A protein has these predicted regions:
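Short S/T/G/P-rich N-terminal loop/turn motif that feeds into the first structured element of a domain
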Residues: 1-74, 80-98
Length: 98
């Protein structure tokens, strides 16, 4: 079963976040990881960011974490994102195949 990391971030305008997200998505794709970015439009979190990063399974998740730790391009983009957006929370979920 696929495994997803679901994160909520606060901060950064669309103009600030979009180029960083595009770079991060390209890095994730290089490792076979799916990346989706959405923006809350209503409610108390309006303007915040919702991120879903999907891995093939838990083994793939563990393997790629080691690779990310050794990838300077990945480390750099994460550092840049942290300058403009704060992660509010992050959860790992098992995706159900319905």
């Amino acid at each position: 079963m696929t495994l997803s990391a679901i994160s909520h971030y606060r901060g950064g305008s669309i103009d600030d976040v979009t180029p960083l997200a595009k770079t991060l998505k390209a890095i994730y794709l290089k490792y076979g990881v799916t990346y989706r970015l959405s923006r809350f439009q209503t409610g108390p979190n309006a303007g915040d960011w919702f991120v879903v990063v999907q891995y093939a399974n838990s083994t793939a998740y563990e393997k790629v974490q080691t690779m990310f730790a050794q990838d300077p391009e990945y480390q750099q983009i994460i550092t840049e994102i942290a300058k403009i957006a704060k992660r509010i929370n992050r959860e790992l979920v098992i995706d159900l195949d319905l």
